[in-house]
Amino acid sequence: MRVEIDSHSGFCFGVVRAISRAEEALQEQGEVFSLGDIVHNRVEVQRLERLGMHTVTHDQMPGLKGRSLFIRAHGEPPSTYRLAEELGIELIDATCPVVAKLQRRVVEAHEKMRQVGGQVVILGKRGHAEVIGLTGQVEAPTLVVETEEDLDQIDFTRPIYFLSQTTQSISLFQHLCDRCLLYTSPSPRDPKTSR
């Protein structure tokens, strides 16, 4: 049997960049702490652990005073950066540039929607590190939808700014946008009955 591996397969550039930054930090410092697994790949996490990377949670941050803490490609909310500063933790920020741009867009979206009484909606997986980082960019509530059924959370009488987690399907995002447009058309249909 012959197995071919697509030359374009593998980690996204944000994860490749984060792994490279982690390797550099490990080479310089010998030991680095990562806030959550650097990547959703057990083999790669174990390889980095053998080099001196330790995965920690937010609850363990107080014990890292004076040490280096790695922010993975998924990014973090501003509260994490503030806590690290308060605790004297040096951050190695490997937030993916695409995610960082999306974080800024979330802040801008909330400002625009605040002015018109609207709402910000993100297509994403609840509890995923990137989504936690996105929703944590502002104090105002952000709706997170995973499926068409979740559109029931949206108040279609108010303006909507719809964004997506970077790893979500473009076709699902477009489908949900189309459904939102249907519900907000001049004669909106009830989302519960027009699926």
Predicted regions and their residues:
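Active-site loop-to-helix "anion-binding N-cap" substructures in soluble metabolic enzymes
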Residues: 2-138, 142-155, 169-170, 175-181
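Short beta-strands and strand-loop turn motifs
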Residues: 6, 163-164, 185
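Active-site donor-nucleotide binding/catalytic segment of nucleotide-sugar enzymes
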Residues: 158-170
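Conserved small/polar residues in nucleotide/adenosyl-binding loops
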Residues: 183-189
